[in-house]
């Protein structure tokens, strides 16, 4: 039954992804960014709805009042595809740091490109860091939030990746606060797995973390400790009660 429900979800997901990609291309030269963001992120909301209908995956938010701080740098745990879609509209308008290869994905990549992301070339890490900081500060000055997954890539549930300091560096340079986001989406929507598991994803949003006079190394460590600490306290997301224990990468 889980395979069938996951298949139906994937079918709707892929068809709707193609549709919103075409819409994004059509409206790109016509509508201003604020309207493009509203239209394109309707797809993100649809995915949340479709996930609930097909796979029985819901979510609850703790600390939602802290999401009203604009502009800010959002630093979130990266376990799944789920958070990339949820956070995109929840903290919007938001510019996301992502690998440029995503733009090559037909339809989906087109929709992404219309939302002012910051695309980086991971084959040239030094130049990528410079571009992240330069464009990140520009987006914040334009009034956008900036979303960063400090671990750089998805980490399987139960693992703790290395937290990069670029998010803290940008926030300090731009003089904006950091909002940390902890969640356990990977338990219901595991990375690189087709099957989706019914349950309730917990999303915990921190109070604004002020950056004035802070050191980026310590600030990054504080964010990491907060995120991983909140995840450790969460009850299992899946209805079957499966919960993994975090293992930090060395």
Language-model region placement:
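Generic preference for hydrophobic
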Residues: 61, 74, 96-97, 203-205
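A hydrophobic membrane-anchoring feature enriched in long, contiguous, low-charge segments
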Residues: 4-30
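A short, well-structured juxtamembrane/interface segment
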Residues: 47-71, 246
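Non-catalytic C-terminal accessory region of glycerolipid acyltransferases
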Residues: 3-4, 129-250
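Thr-Gly-centered strand-to-loop micro-motif
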Residues: 62, 98-99, 120-122, 150, ...
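Catalytic core of membrane glycerolipid acyltransferases/transacylases, capturing the structured
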Residues: 21-41, 52-54, 68-125
């Amino acid at each position: 039954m889980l395979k069938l429900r996951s298949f139906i979800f994937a079918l709707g997901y892929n068809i709707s992804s193609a549709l919103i990609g075409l819409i994004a291309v059509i409206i790109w030269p016509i509508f201003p960014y604020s309207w493009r963001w509203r239209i394109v992120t309707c797809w993100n909301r649809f995915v949340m709805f479709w996930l609930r209908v097909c796979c029985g995956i819901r979510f609850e938010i703790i600390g939602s009042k802290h999401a009203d701080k604009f502009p800010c740098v959002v630093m979130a745990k990266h376990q799944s595809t789920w958070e990339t879609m949820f956070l995109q509209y929840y903290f919007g308008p938001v510019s996301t740091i992502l690998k440029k290869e995503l733009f090559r994905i037909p339809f989906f990549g087109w929709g992404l490109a219309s939302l002012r992301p910051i695309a980086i070339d991971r084959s040239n890490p030094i130049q990528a860091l410079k571009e992240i900081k330069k464009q990140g500060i520009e987006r914040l000055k334009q009034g956008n939030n900036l979303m960063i997954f400090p671990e750089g890539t998805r980490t399987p549930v139960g693992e703790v990746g290395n937290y990069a300091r670029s998010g803290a560096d940008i926030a300090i340079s731009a003089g904006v606060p950091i909002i940390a986001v902890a969640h356990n989406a990977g338990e219901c929507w595991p990375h690189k797995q087709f099957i989706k598991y019914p349950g309730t994803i917990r999303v915990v949003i921190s109070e604004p973390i002020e950056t004035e006079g802070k050191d980026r190394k310590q600030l990054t460590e504080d964010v990491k400790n907060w995120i991983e600490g909140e995840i450790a306290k969460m009850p299992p997301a899946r209805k079957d009660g499966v919960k993994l224990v975090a293992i930090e990468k060395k």
